[in-house]
């Protein structure tokens, strides 16, 4: 069985990159290939220009120290305190006691657990346990943090706080974060770039704002789920995605005035994602798609992504296809 097949992934330094997919898509295997917990059959794993597949022994161990990892299941040692769990990797690395104590105190302050340093895992909440896991993963001052479904076992409020912490660490430390998730909301909240994975392959990838503006994007439909609307006889249903400055333009009223048509708004949403204002609208225009070619071209020329809904919602037509 091939778990990951022909995947090319580039994560820019200092960004948060999310890999989104259902269970069994190959996400966890991909993540384990990054730090060579799974060794790929072919290809390269480059971090800071070094190919991990070419390293052995001490060289590989040093490279792995630059990669932290957190998991869905926290993996804390029940016999150790919070501080003791964070100190454990430092002990393994042979860090002197005084330096170790200072680093543990720094990390606990970073994740907001200073007051719980002497508590045991059984005495703290799930969200606090994940904070311990994050502090432990950062003990060796890694440049890269891998997150394997780190929030999937948490309630929504705690999930939001952990995602906020990860974004804060990304910005304060210049940390590069590669996370996998099956939750669209995780991508919406903190990811700069993302990829959608099915059956071991990427079906789309790139900066989130670019994916949202791409006609037919699965990610755009997932982040902004609009109610299903099949075209009525003699009408055209259009899904319009707009990013950045386009969110401030009155394109609906401009369309109605220019072509003297009644435009019906069936649904919509506007949010801030990856620092950009992004929105989607579902519009209904009178007439079949062939009649609305000029109107669709008008929307596209305004810098909008346009999907024309067919009777099969899984097979939208783009504005370009409709114009042909």
Residue ranges and their predicted role:
Residues 20-22:
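The feature captures the beta-strand-to-loop junction immediately N-terminal to the Walker
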Residues 35:
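Helix-to-loop junction immediately C-terminal to a conserved catalytic motif
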Residues 50-51, 87, 91, 98-115:
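Conserved ABC ATPase "signature" region
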Residues 52-68, 92, 97-98, 211-215:
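ABC ATPase NBD coupling module
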Residues 80-88:
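Short coil-to-helix segment of the ABC ATPase nucleotide-binding domain corresponding to the Q-loop/switch region
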């Amino acid at each position: 069985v091939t778990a990951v097949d022909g995947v090319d992934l580039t994560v820019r330094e200092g960004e948060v990159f999310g890999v989104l997919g259902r269970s069994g898509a190959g996400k966890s295997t991909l993540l384990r290939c990054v730090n060579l917990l799974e060794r790929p059959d072919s290809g390269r794993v480059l971090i800071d220009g070094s190919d991990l597949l070419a390293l052995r022994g001490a060289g590989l161990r040093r490279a792995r120290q630059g990669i932290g990892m957190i998991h869905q299941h926290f993996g804390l040692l029940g016999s150790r305190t919070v501080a003791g769990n964070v100190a454990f990797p430092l002990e393994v690395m042979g860090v002197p006691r005084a330096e170790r104590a200072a680093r543990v105190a720094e990390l606990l302050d970073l994740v907001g657990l200073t007051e719980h340093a002497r508590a045991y895992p059984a005495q703290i909440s799930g969200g606090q346990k994940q904070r311990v896991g994050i502090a432990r993963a950062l003990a060796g001052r890694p440049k890269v943090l891998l997150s394997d479904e780190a929030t999937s076992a948490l309630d929504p409020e705690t999930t939001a706080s952990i995602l906020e912490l990860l974004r804060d660490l990304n910005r304060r430390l210049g940390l590069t974060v590669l996370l996998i998730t099956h939750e669209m909301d995780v991508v919406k909240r903190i990811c700069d770039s993302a990829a959608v994975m099915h059956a071991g392959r990427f079906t789309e990838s790139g900066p989130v704002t670019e994916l949202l503006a791409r006609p037919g994007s699965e990610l755009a439909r997932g982040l902004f789920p609009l109610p299903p609307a099949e075209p009525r006889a003699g009408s055209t249903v259009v899904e319009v995605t707009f990013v950045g400055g386009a969110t401030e333009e009155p394109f609906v009223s401009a369309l109605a005035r220019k072509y003297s048509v009644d435009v019906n708004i069936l649904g919509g949403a506007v949010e801030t994602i990856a620092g950009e204002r992004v929105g989607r609208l579902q519009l209904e225009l009178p007439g079949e798609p062939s009649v609305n070619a000029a109107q669709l071209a008008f929307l596209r020329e305004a810098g909008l992504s346009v999907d024309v809904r067919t009777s099969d919602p899984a097979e939208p037509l783009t504005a370009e296809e409709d114009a042909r």
